[in-house]
Amino acid sequence: EGARADLTKALSMNPIFQVTHAFTLGGAGKNAYNFGAVYGDEKRFYQAGLDDAGNVTMRLNRLLFPGHISKIQAQFAPAGGQSFVQLEHDFQGSDYSMNFKALNPSPTNLTGIYVANYLQTLTPRFALGAEAVYQHPSPEIEEATVGYMAKWVGPAKEWIATAQWQPQGIAQLTYWHQLSE
């Protein structure tokens, strides 16, 4: 009913550099081709892909200096309305972490979605945090919210529990437990 082939060639191991060709022939869907490339070392990771419809995807992560990582994710599509860009920066301090994110930011009319997170460790097993979200999808629409979270860690770090609350009345509880090594 069809065939699929993925051909990957590692051109270098340090830094890592590889290319991939993926083919799909016949079957229920149409024939398809995708080209991908990956490059990375201890400070950067770059990944990109191009398909036969002209869609380009990319992901770039860059360690600027200890504790600071900048990230870019994007998709560019020939069909209107399907492209997006996400810009992000993580900072990991000794007892806190911060993250800033912009989704489809526009410098001309300041539209987009902007998110800031902060998590502060209060004891070795307990942390509190907040998330601010500013949504401005079009010049006529604006909305800002602030949510809160708490994180508890087991004495031997064998479990993690979190609680999150958003002002729209949304609450979320999570629990993770390590069962074995």
Please state what every model-predicted region is:
Residues 52, 60, 71, 119, ...:
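Non-transmembrane, interaction-prone segments in cytosolic or luminal domains
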Residues 43-46, 67-72, 93-100, 124-130, ...:
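Repeated loop/turn-to-beta-strand initiation elements of outer-membrane beta-barrel proteins
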Residues 1, 42, 88, 131, ...:
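Glutamate identity and glutamate-enriched acidic tracts
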Residues 1-105:
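Transmembrane beta-barrel domains of Gram-negative outer membranes and organellar outer membranes
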Residues 75-89, 99-115, 132-146, 166-169:
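Outer-membrane beta-barrel translocator/channel fold
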Residues 33-40, 56-65, 85-94, 114-123, ...:
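Feature captures outer-membrane beta-barrel proteins of Gram-negative bacteria and organelles
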Residues 8, 20, 24, 57, ...:
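Residue-identity detector for threonine
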